[in-house]
Amino acid sequence: MGVMGNFSQERLGMAAGMNAYSQICIDEAVAWAKERKTFGKPLIDNQVIKHKLVDMNRAVRTSRAWTELLSWKVMNGESPIADLAMLKVHASKAMELCAREAMQILGGAGYLRANSGPGKVERIYREVRVNAIGGGSEEIMYDLAARQLGYKS
C-alpha cells in the first residue's frame, strides 16, 4: 500500500471517529433534553429541540452510511480518492453541527469539563477544528476532490 493508500485509511479512520464523536453529542443532548425541565416540561418537548436533534441525526447517519460504503470499496481494492476527500469534509461538518447543537441544547452544562455526562460534549466541541484540519484541511480536501473529479481547465 503506497502513500495514497495510507491517506485513504487515515481519512476513513478519521471519518469513523468523527461519526462516533457526533453520536456522543446526540446521545448527551437527548439525555439532557429528557432530564432538563423548562417551564415545567421536559426540554425535549420543545419543537425546536426536536428539530435540532433530527438535523444532528440526519448529518451523522448520512456520514456513517457513506463511511460504511467507502470502507467496503477500499476493502475490495477500490481507491475512491475524491469520495474519501469529500467524506472527510462531510464527517467534520457533521461533527461540527452535532457539537454546536449539543452545546446549545446543554446550555451552561455543556461548558463543564468532565469525562462523563454533558462534560464530554465540551471536549468534543474543542476537538472539532483539530479533526477538520488533521489528515488534510477542508480546503485541501476540496481541491483534491475537484482534481479527482476532473474540474480543471
Identify the residue ranges that each predicted region occupies.
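Alpha-helical interface subdomain recognition
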Residues: 5-153
